[in-house]
């Protein structure tokens, strides 16, 4: 009886551990806007990666001139893998059912440049979008912003 009770407790703990691991891994599969994994989402690297990828560029054309010195991912294969994660899961920023360079790509780029309110949205939200206000779009984009590492603010 005692052995059976211990085994069932062990079984429950194992299930809890596996459930937590599966949940944790599924969260990691979404990706974030820090495409090159340098610890921050930057308009001139990550934003341009997303824009170029949205236009259909791949390989060297995708990464040419955009790899920064602090990038963890430095090859087209690495960058494309990271882009595919965020593109498939969250690339449709305005919620119109499509990932489009001239809407979603420009929204992300503008956001990463620090634009907000009407300057973020004017002229780039699709007519059939479900997220149309600046606050909706800013909220959606901000959910995938990476946390800034401590060294990011070192002077």
Indicate residue ranges for each PLM-predicted region.
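Bacterial N-terminal signal peptides that target proteins for export
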Residues: 2-12
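Bacterial N-terminal signal peptides
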Residues: 11-21
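Cellulosome-associated attachment modules in secreted, modular CAZymes
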Residues: 23-155
């Amino acid at each position: 009886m005692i052995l059976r009770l211990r085994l069932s407790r062990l079984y429950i703990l194992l299930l809890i551990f596996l459930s937590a691991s599966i949940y944790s891994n599924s969260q990691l599969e979404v990706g974030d806007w820090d495409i090159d994994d340098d610890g921050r989402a930057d308009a001139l690297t990550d934003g341009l990666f997303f824009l170029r990828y949205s236009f259909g560029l791949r390989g060297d054309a995708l990464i040419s001139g955009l790899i920064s010195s602090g990038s963890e991912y430095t090859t087209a294969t690495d960058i494309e893998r990271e882009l595919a994660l965020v593109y498939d899961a969250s690339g449709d920023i305005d919620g119109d059912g499509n990932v489009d360079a001239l809407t979603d790509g420009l929204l992300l780029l503008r956001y990463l440049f620090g634009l907000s309110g009407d300057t973020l949205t004017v002229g780039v939200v699709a007519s059939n979008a479900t997220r149309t206000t600046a606050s909706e779009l800013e909220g959606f984009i901000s959910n995938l912003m990476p946390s800034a590492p401590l060294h990011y603010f070192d002077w």
